[in-house]
Amino acid sequence: MAQETTRDGSDSPSGSVSPPIANGTNNKKDKKSSKKRAHSSGERRSSVSKPARDPSDKPEESPSKKKKRKTTSSTAAAAVPSTITEEVSPSTSVTRSPSPVIDFDGLSRPSRGTRERLEETEAQKQERLDKMKGAVRTLLECIGEDPDREGLLATPERYAKAMLFLTKGYQENVRDIVNGAIFQEGHNEMVIVKDIEVFSMCEHHLVPFTGKMHIGYIPSNAVIGISKLPRIAELFARRLQIQERLTKEVANAIMEILKPQGVAVVMESSHLCMVMRGVQKTTSSTITSCVLGCFESREKTRLEFLSLIGVNR
């Protein structure tokens, strides 16, 4: 009788079947068969019992994808240092936090030059003021005015002091403004402070833009004193700004300070650089927004906020 050589090298009679290599394939088939039987027998899947999801929300990720993303993010975080050292002068360096808007000592960014204003002596303050007065006097002369005439004698000093006031947000401390006014209330519904008057200076032409800001957030149990939201808005407005960045900085600061589920900021303003010069469109307004967290991922939540502040009516 003819013989065949089996996988292990031994001879076996022709026509006989070699024993299976492993039973892994059979086990998989058995599992699939049991799943089909369970489905056909009317057994409920666990996903059916879950509450209905808003179709506009982002789909939930499977546990394996979440685990993979968590591993990736932790690896990326390990590659980024927790603090960043930035050279301020040849003799000193400042260790900066990874925050996009708040520096290591609570000052809001950019704060490299303005930290000097916070720490300077009275003599240094007067020296700064005198330097600014001289610059304003030069501007008056360059436009053809007489800085020594009666109406302009005190203008250089007035303008210098006004400019220091309008940019005082650089040297204000976020921690001092919040002053510990964060309370664990177990509240998880939307909080909105709307129609906050905002005055800022366009960094391109050094003329004002004014308008209203609406701030909303959904807490993660902790709430902030409602007066702190307008104060945070003013802190970032009292500097040279553009509206897009101002909107984003306010949202990022609240997100960092409070760690809520999400933050939404909408601002509508009129820019004098577009009203008094350039295209000279007096009735135009500019609207900007920044949505973070659940306001970004859930359309239903975002639309509720816009409806409550009256934007989409």
From Swiss-Prot:
Keywords: Allosteric enzyme, Folate biosynthesis, GTP-binding, Hydrolase, Metal-binding, Nucleotide-binding, Zinc. Belongs to the GTP cyclohydrolase I family. GO terms for biological process: folic acid biosynthetic process; tetrahydrobiopterin biosynthetic process; tetrahydrofolate biosynthetic process. Toroid-shaped homodecamer, composed of two pentamers of five dimers. Disulfide bonds: none annotated. It catalyses: GTP + H2O = 7,8-dihydroneopterin 3'-triphosphate + formate + H(+). InterPro entries: GTP-CH-I_C/QueF, GTP-CH-I_N, GTP_CycHdrlase_I, GTP_CycHdrlase_I_CS, GTP_CycHdrlase_I_dom. Pathway: Cofactor biosynthesis; 7,8-dihydroneopterin triphosphate biosynthesis; 7,8-dihydroneopterin triphosphate from GTP: step 1/1. GTP cyclohydrolase 1 is the first enzyme in the biosynthetic pathway leading to folic acid. It comes from the Eukaryota. One of its GO terms (cellular component) is cytoplasm. Residues 1-10, 40-64 have a biased composition (Basic and acidic residues). This is GTP cyclohydrolase 1. Residues 29-39 have a biased composition (Basic residues). CDD domains: GTP_cyclohydro1. Zn(2+) binds at C202, H205, C273. Its EC number is 3.5.4.16. The gene is gch-1. Residues 11-20, 72-102 have a biased composition (Low complexity).
